[in-house]
């Protein structure tokens, strides 16, 4: 009986050389490649499929864009997903990709699961958090063989595997509908200024056109319309990436704390994510109480950490989502924003659940008798006065 292994396949250098390695070094008879479409460019998906069919024994391409948006990105928006300023496009996609690889492995009778992640990054942990929910063996050639990028490039050439990187320009790109990450090579030097050529989604802010006003509509905490036109999540995010990217919105160059404790220099593009997260957070301020906002900020931070680590099967992750889902019942309305040369500015917001009262807050309003605040003011900071009087004095 053939000894099969299912490989999470992207079409890139790492996963491509895993195919011969799994046979030559690990003794598998059949390598089944699984490419999961979470919004990569169509040409990348097609090229990965074409390459896999030439060098693997069996290949599957799965289009899960709708599932990715509805079950992963929308919960991220509702949770104001953010890890140290990173919108977690790669992080949130990995568990879904891993689950699809497991499904194919079980369908095809594979005895092992493999990925092309290194031993220094986060993705190995995200994939394996899902893979190890099964009883199948888990193989990580890059980590286990301690391979370098230069060695991989030469190995690929020896095996006739085309690669899209060179030793002169060895950065790697990971892309889905929510974000595009660029890392490796000279970019690993935090003192190196990235060349403009690494950016594909965003216009350089100084070259961006004049300002554009847009309106995002929300229901139950998720975006449902753009400029008054209802549309599905995939279409909305794709359009927003183009619009915001044209205005130079959504570039991040950051030092990121990886799960293992290493600090890494990361470059990201995420136009739609920047706009939609800013709009959602602003709308929440209009409809949620101060107590809800304060507590939800803590919940959001914990949610984001679990998502970044790839721990979406943790019971706590479900618990946090239950609370977040309840708060989002009132997060509905519209947010008007201005996009201008790399910046996003909220101009206006409306909601049928707004807790804002223009009459009550106005300096000219008479609904509240200002004298009623006198008693409250007398005892505001009361404990501090007692401390200063009886403790500091002595």
From Swiss-Prot:
Q: Which reaction does it catalyse?
A: L-citrulline + L-aspartate + ATP = 2-(N(omega)-L-arginino)succinate + AMP + diphosphate + H(+)
Name of the protein described by the UniProt record: Argininosuccinate synthase
Q: Which domain of life is it from?
A: Archaea
| Pfam family for this entry, one | Arginosuc_syn_C
Residues binding ATP are 8-16, 116
What PROSITE patterns does this protein's entry cite? Answer: ARGININOSUCCIN_SYN_1, ARGININOSUCCIN_SYN_2
Subunit relationships: Homotetramer.
What residues bind L-citrulline, as annotated? Answer: 86, 91, 122, 126, 172, 181, 256, 268
Pathway where this protein functions: Amino-acid biosynthesis; L-arginine biosynthesis; L-arginine from L-ornithine and carbamoyl phosphate: step 2/3
- Gene encoding the protein: argG
Please report the organism this UniProt entry assigns to the protein: Methanococcoides burtonii (strain DSM 6242 / NBRC 107633 / OCM 468 / ACE-M)
UniProt keyword annotations, A-Z: Amino-acid biosynthesis, Arginine biosynthesis, ATP-binding, Cytoplasm, Ligase, Nucleotide-binding
Signal peptide span per the entry?
Answer: none
- Could you tell me the Gene Ontology terms of the biological process aspect for this record? argininosuccinate metabolic process; L-arginine biosynthetic process; urea cycle
Q: Which residues bind L-aspartate?
A: 118, 122-123
Location in the cell reads:
Cytoplasm
**EC top class, as a word:** ligase
Give a yes or no for keyword Acetylation in this entry: no
Q: Known EC number(s)?
A: 6.3.4.5
**Which InterPro entries does the annotation name?**
Arginosuc_syn_C, Arginosuc_syn_N, Arginosuc_synth, Arginosuc_synth_CS, Arginosuc_synth_type_1_subfam, AS_cat/multimer_dom_body, Rossmann-like_a/b/a_fold
Recorded family membership: Belongs to the argininosuccinate synthase family. Type 1 subfamily.
Molecular function, one GO term: argininosuccinate synthase activity
């Amino acid at each position: 009986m053939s000894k099969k292994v299912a490989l999470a396949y992207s079409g890139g250098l790492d996963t491509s050389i895993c195919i011969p390695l799994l046979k030559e070094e690990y003794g598998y008879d059949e390598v089944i490649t699984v490419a999961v479409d979470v919004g990569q460019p169509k040409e990348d998906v097609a090229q990965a499929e074409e390459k896999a069919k030439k060098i693997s024994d069996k290949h599957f391409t799965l289009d899960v864009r709708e599932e990715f948006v509805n079950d992963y990105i929308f919960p991220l928006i509702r949770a104001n997903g953010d890890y140290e300023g990173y919108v977690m496009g790669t992080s949130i996609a990995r568990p879904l990709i891993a689950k699809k690889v497991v499904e194919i492995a079980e369908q095809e009778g594979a005895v092992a699961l493999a990925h092309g992640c290194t031993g220094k990054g986060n993705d190995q942990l995200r994939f394996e958090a899902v893979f190890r929910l099964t009883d199948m063996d888990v193989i990580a050639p890059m980590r286990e063989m301690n391979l370098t990028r230069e060695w991989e490039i030469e190995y690929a050439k020896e095996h006739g595997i085309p690669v899209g990187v060179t030793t002169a320009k060895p950065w790697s790109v990971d892309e889905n509908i929510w974000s595009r990450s660029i890392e490796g090579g000279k970019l690993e030097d935090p003192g190196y200024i990235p060349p403009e050529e690494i950016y594909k989604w965003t216009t350089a802010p100084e070259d961006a056109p004049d300002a554009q006003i847009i309106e995002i509509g929300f229901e139950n905490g998720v975006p449902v319309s753009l400029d008054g036109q209802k549309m599905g999540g995939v279409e909305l995010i794709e359009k927003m990436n183009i619009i915001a990217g044209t205005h130079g919105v959504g570039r991040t160059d950051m030092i990121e704390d990886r799960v293992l404790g290493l600090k890494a220099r990361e470059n990201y593009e995420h136009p739609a994510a920047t706009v939609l997260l800013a709009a959602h957070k602003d709308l929440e301020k209009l409809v949620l109480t101060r107590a809800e906002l304060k507590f939800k900020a803590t919940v959001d931070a914990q949610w984001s950490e679990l998502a970044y680590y790839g721990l979406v099967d943790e019971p706590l992750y479900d618990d946090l989502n239950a609370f977040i889902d309840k708060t989002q019942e009132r997060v509905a309305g519209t947010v008007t924003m201005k996009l201008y040369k790399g910046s996003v500015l909220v101009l206006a917001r409306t909601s049928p659940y707004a807790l804002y009262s223009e009459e009550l807050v106005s300096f000219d309003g008479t609904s509240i008798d200002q004298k009623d605040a006198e008693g409250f003011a007398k005892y505001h900071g009361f404990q501090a006065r007692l401390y200063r009087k009886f403790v500091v004095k002595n």
